[in-house]
A protein has these predicted regions:
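Soluble catalytic regions of membrane-associated enzymes that act on cell-envelope
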Residues: 2-171
């Protein structure tokens, strides 16, 4: 009989010292600093690290249906053998469908009335999935089947941590 594997249940802690974040004169940053530094972290579990060393493929599709998935063997294999989130929906945001992609890639809610992807190109985005994977030694690529500059993805996606390819730039 094999021994039960040991599951690391230590806290998930981001090595960030909130005391070093300059907040003087900025009430919003002060409030955020106080909030995040007081939070109790969640604990790791049996799923933590289960994909270490594996490839990760995230597909975001503006409209996608299971009805024709069997006609595309590679997508069919990914859907039937991987994680398939069938009840994930993004709300209708005011600007464009790219806001759903923005939410999926950044983990944040887009700002109303503006092109969040374009605006994010000027911000530090260290916590995106691509940036986190790069820290672990992975490469992160993003592809789109429209023109390279569509929705200013040529500015936003490299800033999110991706090597970006689209029509006119590698696709």
């Amino acid at each position: 009989v094999l021994p039960e594997p040991v599951v690391d249940t230590s806290p998930n802690v981001l090595e960030l010292d909130f005391d070093t974040v300059p907040t003087e004169g900025n009430d919003v940053l002060s409030e955020l600093n106080a909030y995040f530094s007081s939070r109790t972290p969640t604990n790791k579990n049996e799923k933590t690290g289960m994909f270490k060393g594996c490839n990760l493929i995230l597909i975001t599709a503006e409209s996608f249906s299971y009805l024709a998935i069997d006609l595309t063997p590679t997508l069919y294999k990914l859907q039937t053998e991987g994680f398939n989130f069938t009840n994930f929906y993004t709300p209708y945001w005011d600007v464009s469908t790219s806001d759903g992609e923005y939410a999926a890639l950044t983990g944040t809610i887009p700002k109303p009335g503006t092109w969040s992807f374009r605006d994010s190109a000027e911000n530090a985005m260290p916590l995106t999935m691509a940036q986190q994977l790069k820290r672990l030694g992975y490469s992160a690529y993003a592809y789109h089947d429209h023109t390279y500059t569509y929705y200013d993805r040529n500015l936003s996606h490299p800033n999110l941590g991706y090597v970006y390819r689209a029509l006119g730039n590698g696709v």
